[in-house]
Amino acid sequence: FAESPYAFTEADLLRGKALYQSFCAICHGARGEGDGRAIPLGVPKPRSYHDPAVRDQPEGYFYFAATNGFGRMLPYKSRIPERERWLIAHYIKRCLLSEACPEEVVHAEVH
């Protein structure tokens, strides 16, 4: 998988969280556990990001999935700009799948 061409700052993580909440959390859930609000409505449950087969993937894996779709997930290439897709991938790896997320991002309310 490709590596991000962007060097994101900690401030960028707030934007990544907002993008994730807008585009991803409805299916993947706030913590990436595959328990989003759409699941009780009949949307097939996605695999948890915390499954070792997913958790151990590089950032480029999540960018690739957001760009091209994955399984039943539709591609977002035409809906989310490239930098923002990378930012979502960075947020997933840094904040959902590691302990390296800044406290202000963890507790921030985003819209």
Task: Enumerate the language-model features and the residues they cover.
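Sequence/structural segment immediately N-terminal to covalent heme-attachment motifs in c-type
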Residues: 10-33, 67-68, 88
